[in-house]
């Protein structure tokens, strides 16, 4: 480009310094005479102006002279445009511009993209298997890498399998997919927050009910322990006072039950030959009371079941239970324990009662069975609570060894 363009005074020579990059050769310099201008349209100025109208010069670019008498009055292009158009070259962007391949991702099989492909594959199929997902992704990779060497291709295929299993394990941990043996099922993301909240409330209520049931069972067991230990102490005291053991026919062994009914009730009892089964038939309702309820009537529980326990009786009751249960005994005496008692007895018009049935009813909460049981009288009617058995979970994390199963 030209460095300088200088113009001397009017009516003198026009000197042009040519481009440094151009080769040196003779330069034609055209001189032109600029006559003093006559009337010209100039912008209106305010105040005095320092511009000399008679000495005005029109600066023009050197152009090809058309005639000797035609003055050079200007250029169709401004200087900057004129010089830029002489040296400007146009370049087009390469087809690979803007594409940056990451070093660790070949053919779009990086960890992030591969995880998305695993997501899309399982979501599209709904129910599939690990081998099916891996096979589809490996097939896509092989179709996209035809020019790869065998060793590199085998390494990439093994890497894809490993990353596919990792992605499936993460989706299972997030509960987006589920696995049953070799089958994989799509679950999806949970979007219904209101339903989840309602489910949590229902689950919370169920757990609170179970806590209440456990509290009631604990209260019954504490009362039984206090009643039996207090009964043992009382019998020992009576034997020391009379200095002899009671007669065998005057002793009632525990466990036992008491069946009560109205005096006008007609009771028919049938006994089997081996005296192992008894059939009772009542023409009116009746009640069955177990040994713990009878001991409560006798005052062996110090009134803990009703919350009316004196300070002295409370001290004795605390001495009859392990130290870890003493706070619960105090709550029972104050009436702040969470247990609830019922007083309605079991009623029926007729039932078979075997010796084993009588024993089970009498023992009650001392031996809690897994199937649950019902307790009459002051016992709480406790529904069966199924214990969740811990099953052997064979659904380990997915690995490449699953293909050999």
Swiss-Prot record:
Please tell me, according to the UniProt entry, what happens when changing residue 161 to R.
No effect on down-regulation of E2F transcriptional activity
Gene Ontology biological-process entries: DNA damage response; negative regulation of DNA-binding transcription factor activity; negative regulation of G1/S transition of mitotic cell cycle; regulation of transcription by RNA polymerase II
Instruction: Provide the induction entry.
Output: In response to DNA damage.
| Keywords tagged on the record | Cytoplasm, DNA-binding, Nucleus, Transcription, Transcription regulation
In this chain, composition skew of type Acidic residues spans 384-405
InterPro entries in the record, alphabetically?
E2F-DP_heterodim (IPR037241), E2F_WHTH_DNA-bd_dom (IPR003316), TF_DP_C_sf (IPR038168), Transc_factor_DP_C (IPR014889), Transcrpt_fac_DP (IPR015648), WH-like_DNA-bd_sf (IPR036388), WH_DNA-bd_sf (IPR036390)
**Known tissue expression:** Predominantly expressed in testis. Low level of expression in pancreas. Highly expressed in ovarian and colon cancer cell lines.
Region DCB2: start-end pairs:
254-310
Compartments reported by the entry: Nucleus; Cytoplasm
What cellular component terms from Gene Ontology apply here? chromatin; cytoplasm; nucleus; transcription regulator complex
The segment annotated DCB1 runs over 209-241
Gene Ontology terms, MF aspect: DNA binding; DNA-binding transcription factor binding; RNA polymerase II-specific DNA-binding transcription factor binding; transcription regulator inhibitor activity
- Annotated region (Disordered) at 68-104, 369-405
Task: Give residue spans, biased composition: Polar residues.
Answer: 80-93, 369-379
Q: Which residues bind DNA?
A: 108-190
Q: Major place of localization?
A: nucleus
Q: Where is this motif: DEF box?
A: 156-190
Entry remark concerning the domains of this protein = The potential DNA-binding domain differs in sequence from that of other DP family members and cannot bind DNA.
Assembly mode = Heterodimer: with E2F family members. TFDP3/E2F heterodimers do not bind DNA and repress E2F-dependent transcriptional activity.
Q: Which PANTHER family match?
A: TRANSCRIPTION FACTOR DP, TRANSCRIPTION FACTOR DP FAMILY MEMBER 3
Q: What is this protein called?
A: Transcription factor Dp family member 3
Q: Which organism is it from?
A: Homo sapiens
């Amino acid at each position: 480009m030209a460095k300088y363009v200088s113009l001397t005074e009017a009516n003198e020579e026009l000197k042009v310094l040519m481009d440094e990059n151009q080769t040196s050769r003779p330069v034609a310099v055209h001189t032109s005479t600029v006559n003093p201008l006559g009337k010209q349209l100039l912008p209106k100025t305010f105040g005095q102006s320092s511009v000399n109208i008679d000495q005005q010069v029109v600066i023009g670019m050197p152009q090809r002279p058309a005639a000797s008498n035609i003055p050079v009055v200007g250029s169709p292009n401004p200087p900057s445009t004129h010089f830029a158009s002489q040296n400007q070259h146009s370049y087009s962007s390469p087809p690979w511009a803007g594409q940056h391949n990451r070093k660790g991702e070949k053919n779009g099989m990086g960890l992030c993209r591969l995880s998305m492909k695993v997501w899309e594959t399982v979501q599209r199929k709904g129910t599939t298997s690990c081998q099916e997902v891996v096979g589809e992704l490996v097939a896509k990779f092989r179709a996209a890498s035809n020019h790869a060497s065998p060793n590199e291709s085998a390494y990439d295929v093994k890497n894809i399998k490993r990353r596919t299993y990792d992605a499936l394990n993460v989706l299972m941990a997030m509960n987006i997919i589920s696995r049953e043996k070799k089958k994989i099922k799509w679950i999806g993301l949970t979007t219904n927050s209101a339903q989840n909240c309602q489910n949590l409330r229902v689950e919370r209520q169920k757990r609170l009910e179970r806590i209440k049931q456990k509290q009631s069972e604990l209260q019954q067991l504490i009362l039984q322990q206090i009643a039996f230990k207090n009964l043992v102490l009382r019998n020992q005291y009576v034997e020391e006072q009379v200095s002899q053991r009671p007669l065998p026919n005057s002793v009632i062994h525990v466990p036992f039950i008491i069946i009560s009914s109205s005096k006008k009730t007609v009771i028919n009892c049938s006994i089997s030959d081996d005296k192992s089964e008894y059939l009772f038939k009542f023409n009116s309702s009746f009640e069955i009371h177990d040994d713990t309820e009878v001991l409560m009537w006798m005052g062996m529980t110090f009134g803990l079941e009703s919350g009316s326990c004196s300070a002295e009786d409370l001290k004795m009751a605390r001495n009859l239970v392990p130290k870890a249960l003493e706070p619960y005994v105090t709550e029972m005496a104050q009436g702040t324990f969470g247990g609830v008692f019922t007083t309605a007895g079991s009623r029926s018009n007729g039932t078979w009662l075997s010796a084993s049935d009588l024993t089970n009813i009498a023992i009650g909460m001392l031996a809690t069975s897994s199937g649950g049981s019902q307790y009459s009288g002051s016992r709480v009617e406790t529904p069966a609570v199924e214990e969740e058995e811990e099953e052997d979970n064979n659904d380990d994390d997915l690995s490449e060894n699953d293909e050999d199963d």
